[in-house]
């Protein structure tokens, strides 16, 4: 039965990764090219030109790999162990798992270290940023767990109380942001264009997780095998 969970997670990840890769190959790459073109207007040097087809192929391939990783790790292994604890059932539970995955992998870290356009220089050293990113991933995982526990503990309360209790642990993210060291960035791109770039990256990641959850829900639950349905016969 565990194999069925892994297969469904891989299929959902493959579909989500393919959609994400296509998004990157079209919208994401076009946005990046626009940012780099703007940046080149403020510099005197030129970098090597990469073929557009090659760039698109790399984007699609990278998206598929990310999708497979998240699909197998989160919706294969994770869903196998966490399914009974997830809030709701069916698509609701899968969307909750996707939200927890996004918050852990990207959402919480990006509150401290948002994605930056090409050419931006960051004040913090690379090792410091990596450690900070890993730490905020841990915070995201803890917050996600706290949200699920709050949801389950308020099962018999009113909807408003349950919703408030479930969302309350998200306030811990503000504490993490306040305690994190500042990371000033500098670059030739205007603030509005940089913000649009970041939101494009966020939209792509949200779409990746949502697509994996939707496809995983469409695949349904793994069927129990005959051996798992049978009961031991009593001795005469």
Kindly give the residue locations of the regions a language model identified.
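Juxtamembrane/disordered regions of integral membrane proteins
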Residues: 1-236
């Amino acid at each position: 039965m565990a194999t069925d969970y892994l297969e469904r997670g891989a299929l959902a990840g493959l579909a989500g990764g393919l959609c994400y890769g296509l998004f990157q190959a079209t919208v994401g790459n076009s946005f990046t090219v626009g940012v780099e073109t703007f940046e080149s207007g403020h510099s005197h040097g030129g970098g090597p030109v990469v073929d557009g087809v090659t760039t698109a192929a790399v984007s699609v391939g990278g998206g598929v790999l990310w999708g497979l990783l998240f699909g197998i790790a989160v919706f294969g292994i994770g869903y196998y162990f966490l399914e009974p604890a997830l809030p709701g059932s069916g698509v609701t539970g899968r969307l909750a798992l996707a939200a927890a995955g996004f918050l852990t992998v990207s959402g919480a870290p990006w509150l401290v270290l948002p994605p930056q356009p090409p050419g931006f220089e960051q004040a913090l050293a690379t090792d410091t940023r990596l450690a900070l990113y890993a730490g905020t991933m841990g915070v995201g995982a803890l917050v996600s767990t706290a949200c699920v526990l709050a949801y389950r503990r308020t099962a018999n309360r009113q909807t408003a109380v349950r919703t408030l209790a479930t969302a309350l642990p998200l306030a811990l993210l503000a504490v993490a942001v306040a305690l994190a060291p500042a990371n000033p960035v500098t670059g030739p791109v205007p603030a509005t264009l940089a913000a649009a770039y970041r939101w494009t990256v966020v939209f792509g990641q949200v779409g990746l997780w949502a697509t994996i959850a939707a496809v995983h829900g469409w695949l349904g639950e793994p069927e129990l095998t005959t051996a798992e349905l049978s009961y031991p016969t009593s001795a005469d």
